[in-house]
Regions:
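Hydrophobic alpha-helical transmembrane segments
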Residues: 195-208
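Hydrophobic transmembrane alpha-helical segments in integral membrane proteins
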Residues: 1-20
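Juxtamembrane segments at transmembrane-helix boundaries
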Residues: 19-39, 51-184, 191, 207, ...
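Conserved nucleotide-binding and Mg2+-coordinating catalytic segments in signaling enzymes
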Residues: 221-243, 258-266
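Short aromatic-rich membrane-water interface segments that cap or initiate transmembrane helices
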Residues: 187-197
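Cell-envelope/extracellular polymer assembly enzymes that use nucleotide-activated donors
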Residues: 254
């Protein structure tokens, strides 16, 4: 299939965007030392996206199964690195073992795909794993943001990644419903796919930047809430903690009243 100039321009722009992002996060990790562990993972995620999309650009429908798996595996590894970056950024326990197990399951299932329908079934498996990985990253990002800010701000931070996850879920469901030969006709052109990856790379790096900003602001707020010499909380921090304690106390009292009512009924 001949490669159009539009596809070439889209690929160059994607490579430029992901490459600049990878270099920027690497500088933040090594030189500026801003969240070094998380920034390094974000840089690796962008590098893996560059490699995976580059292989995807030269992939043809008649390519062998290993070539198909190579591009998908690199992009899925980018999703794993992205999730690991969020976990490191917000000081959460690592989930690399679970991600490796899922990747092994994906690889085993992908090897069982017949050659005459590899585009359909590999796309279905790719969408399923992408939804699981990005969906869990969305949950991590929302929970970490909601612990420091109001829920509407946490929703705004996690919304781009949640939208991407839902798109992969929609693709998975459509792959189940539409016949394999129809899906091949739908994905015959690559321009739409490159536009999707361009938006994806842009939204992912915006989400990474916003999550890093959330973590930075939360850390500054935590340092500002307490006096570094005496360890005492300031007036605003005390008011927030008193409100939280009052809310917990009211919940416990309501729970106790419900239990007492049930006991009396018995």
């Amino acid at each position: 299939m001949p490669i159009s100039s539009t596809e070439q321009q889209l690929l160059v722009f994607i490579m430029l965007l992901a490459g600049v992002s990878a270099i920027a996060w690497l500088i933040m990790s090594r030189l500026m030392r801003i969240a070094p562990s998380a920034s390094l993972r974000f840089s690796v995620a962008n590098m893996l996206l560059i490699a995976g999309i580059s292989i995807l650009f030269f992939r043809q429908p008649d390519a062998n199964l290993v070539f198909w798996q190579g591009s998908d595996l690199l992009i899925l590894l980018a999703f794993v690195a992205l999730k690991a970056g969020f976990l490191a950024l917000f000081k959460r326990p690592s989930a690399i073992k679970a991600d490796i197990i899922l990747l092994l399951v994906w690889s085993i299932l992908a090897l069982q795909v017949p050659d005459n329908a590899k585009e359909h079934w590999l796309g279905l498996l790719f969408s399923a794993f992408a939804f699981i990985s990005l969906g869990s990253s969305t949950v991590i990002l929302y929970q970490a943001s909601a612990s420091s800010f109001k829920r509407r701000y946490a929703v705004g931070v996690a919304a781009p990644l949640a939208g991407i996850s839902l798109l992969f879920l929609l693709r998975f469901v459509s792959s189940l419903v539409i016949a394999p030969h129809s899906m091949a006709a739908v994905h015959q052109g690559k321009s739409e796919l490159y536009w999707a990856y361009l938006v994806f790379v842009l939204l992912v790096n915006i989400t990474i930047f916003s999550s890093t900003l959330v973590r930075l602001v939360a850390k500054i707020r935590h340092l500002a809430d307490r006096d570094q010499l005496t360890g005492l909380y300031n007036r605003f921090a005390l008011n927030r903690k008193l409100a939280q304690l009052q809310q917990l106390h009211s919940r416990g009292r309501c729970g106790g009243e419900v239990k007492c009512t049930r006991c009396r009924a018995v």
